[in-house]
C-alpha cells in the first residue's frame, strides 16, 4: 500500500513539475544561444582584425595555438618533452612572423611590389631557357635577363635573396614552405582583397541580386567548376552583381555563360558581363540583342521567351533566357575547343591554371594549328630538296620524327583544319538563319501593333497599369480607379469596326487565339506562362460580376459567355500543365544524355569517331570523289581507328629499388594487355560494319600485333636488365663483405667476384642489339649514303659494346699470381708488401691446411655471424656491428626462402633449380 502511494506521489510530482522544467530548459537554451551569439561576434571580430592586419591575425592564431597546447599539457595529454618541442616550434614561428613584418615594413619594396615581382620570376626563367635553347651566348642572356631581374627587385642583393628563395622552393619544397612564413601577410592581403571585391559588388548593385558576399563567392566557385577558371568566374560574378540588373536566379547561369562567351570570342570577361547585363529592360529585348550580337539563341527559344514575357511573368522570362543562353554558350565553347589543335587546347588549360602568366610566350613556343602545318611542310620540303640541311634533317628522322610519321601528322592536321572550317561555315549559316527569323519576327510584331483592336490595346494598358500600381505599393481602390479611367478613355472613342462583337465574344476569341498559340508552342515542347492564374482571376471577376446589382453592356456580355470562357480557361490551364510536364521530361532526357556522354569510355568515343569518319567518306563518295581517293582515305581511317600502345617510362631503380621497378613493369604489362584486347575488340566491331575493307582491317590487325609484340619485348628486356642489375649488386655487396672480413684471397670473395663479373657481362650483352638498331636508324634516313652509313654505324656500335664486354672480362682479382714469384715488381697493384713472398700453389695449400687445423682447435667465438633478414622494403641494406668480441653482419634481402623474381632469374641464368631438404 505504501509502495502504491509512493508511486502515485512520484507521478504527481513529475506531472506538476513538468511545466517548470520546460521553462527552465527554454531559459537555458536562450542563455546558451546568447552565449553562442557573443562567441560568434567575438570570433567575427578576430577574423576582421586578421583580414585588416594580416600579421596581427597570424600572431593571434599562433597565440591561440600556444594557449591550447598549454591546456593539453596541464591536463596530462601531452608529455613534458613533447610540450617543450612543440612550444619551441610555435615560438620560432612567432619570431619569424614578427621578423618578416619588420623586414617588410623597413624594406625598399612594399608587399604588393614584392608579390608582383615574384609573379614575373617564372616568365623571366622561361625567357632564359628559351634564349639559351635558341643558341644565344650565356653572357648575353645573363646581361639581358639579369638586368631585368635586378630592376624587378630593386637591386642585386634583393634580387639574389628573392631568387634564392624561389629556386630553393623549386629544389626543396620543405625549405620553400619554411620561406612562405615570411610572406604570410601577403596571402592575407589577397584574401581580404577578394572578399572586399565581392562585398563592393553587392553594394554597388544596390543588392539587386539578393545574395551576400559569401553567396556571390560560392556562385563564382560553382561557375569555375564548369568553366575551369576561378579568376574568370570571380570577375564575371562581380561584374554582373555590380550592374544591379541581374537577379539571384540569373547569376549562376549568366556567370557561366559570360566565361564561355569570353573564351570563344576572345573578349575580356568584364566587357562580356557588362554587355549581357545591359541588353535591355525586358527579356524579349535582351533575347533579340543577344541573338544579334552573339547568335546564341534559336528562333524557337526566342519565341518561348517572348511568349512568357508577354504574359506578364518577366522574371521567369529572364530566367529562361539565362538558362538557354548558358546552355548554348557552353555548346559553342565545346565546338570552339574541338576546333583547336591539341597543343592549343593544352596551352589553354595551362594558361588557365597559371592565370595567363605565359601568354606572351605562346605564339613563339606553342604554335597553333596552321603554324604546325607550316612547320611540318617545311621539314618535309627540306628533306625532299636534299643538300646538307636535308641530310641533317633526315639523320634525325626516326620514330615520331620520321618522314612517314610527319606526313601522317600533316594529313591529320589538314583534315582537322578543313573539317573545322566546314563546321564553322555551317554554324554561321545556322546562326544567320536564326537571326533572320528573329529579326523577321520582331518586325512582324511591330507591324501587328498597327492592326490591334481597341479592345486589345485597352487590355494591355489595364494589365500594365495593374502591375505598375502593385509595384508602387498602391491599394486596390487606387488601381481600380486608374483602370476605370482607361476604360472610359476607350469608351469615348468610337469603334472603327462595323458590326463589332460584344465584350464576351471578343474575350472568347482572344482566349481561343491564346490556345492556338500554345498549341504551336506545344509542338516545340516549350513552357508558356501561368494560365492557371488567369483562370483564378477570371473566377474572382465572375463572382464579383454576379454580386453586383447593375452591370454594363460589356459586363452582361461576359456573364452571358461565362461558361464558354471558363471552359476555355480550363483548357488553357490543362495545356499549360502538359507543357510544363514535357519541359521537365525534356530536361531530364537532356541530363540523361549528358550523363551518358560523361560515362563513355575512350574506346566508345574512338568507335563513334571512326563511324562518323566513314559516314562523311560515304557522302563524299556520293558527291563524286574518285575510287582511288575513297580507297586511300578509307585506309587512313582504318589506320587511325586504334590508339597507340601505352608507353613505359623506362627503368629507374633509384627510388624504389629493383623490386619497385619490377612492380612497375608488371603494371605496364597489364596495361599493355588491356590495351591490346580493347583495340582488337574495336577492330572487330569496325570490321563487322565495314566488311568490304577486310584487307585493310587485316593489315591494321597485323600492325597492332607487331606493336604489341614490340612493346612486350621492350618490357621483357627491361625486366632482364633489372634482374641482372639486382644480382650484380647483390654479389658486389657480398664480395665487398668477403673482402672486408675474409680478405681478397678468400674463396668466398673469389666466388662472389666471378658472379658479379658474369652478371655485368650479361647486362652489357643485352644492350648490344638495341645499340646496333639505334645506330642504324640514326644514319639510315640520310639520302643515297644513308643505308651504308647505317650499317657502318651499327657495326661500330656493336664493336664498342663487345669491347666493353672484353674489358669486363679482363678485370681480374688485383694482385693475383698463379705460378708464384720471388719479389714484388716495381709497377702494378699487388697485395704484397716489401719483404713478403708469393708462394707456389703447393706450398700455399700446405699453409692453408695448417691454418685450418689451427682454427679447428680454437673456439668459434671470433668467427663472424651473418644474419639473413627478409624485408622487401629494406632489401639491399647491409649493417655490421661488434658484440661480445664477435662481428655480426645483417644482410637484408627481399626474398629469403620464397620462389621470388630474383630466385627465378638466377635459376634461369645458371640452369639451377631448388631441391627439397
From Swiss-Prot:
UniProt-listed GO biological process terms: symbiont genome ejection through host cell envelope, long flexible tail mechanism; viral tail assembly
Coiled-coil residue spans: 501-528, 575-602
Spans annotated as Disordered: 852-877
Entry's localization field: Virion
Gene Ontology cellular component annotations, sorted alphabetically: virus tail
Swiss-Prot/TrEMBL keywords: Coiled coil, Viral genome ejection through host cell envelope, Viral long flexible tail ejection system, Viral penetration into host cytoplasm, Viral release from host cell, Viral tail assembly, Viral tail protein, Virion, Virus entry into host cell
Keyword Coiled coil: yes
Pfam family, one: TMP_2
InterPro entries according to UniProt: GpH_LAMBDA, Phage_tape_measure_N
Primary localisation category: virion
Functional summary from the UniProt entry: Serves as a ruler that controls the length of tail by stopping the tail tube polymerization and is probably released from the tail shaft during infection to facilitate DNA translocation into the host cell. Assembles into a multimeric linear form probably arranged as a coil of alpha-helices and stabilized by the covering tail assembly proteins. Its C-terminus fixes the tail tip complex, thereby forming the tail assembly initiator complex. Tail tube proteins polymerize around the tape measure protein, displacing the tail assembly proteins.
The family this protein is said to belong to: Belongs to the Lambdavirus tape measure protein family.
Summary of subunit composition and partner proteins: Interacts with the tail initiator complex presumably through its C-terminus domain. Interacts with the tail assembly proteins.
Name of the protein in its database record: Tape measure protein
Protein species of origin: Pseudomonas phage PAJU2
Phylogenetic lineage: Viruses, Duplodnaviria, Heunggongvirae, Uroviricota, Caudoviricetes
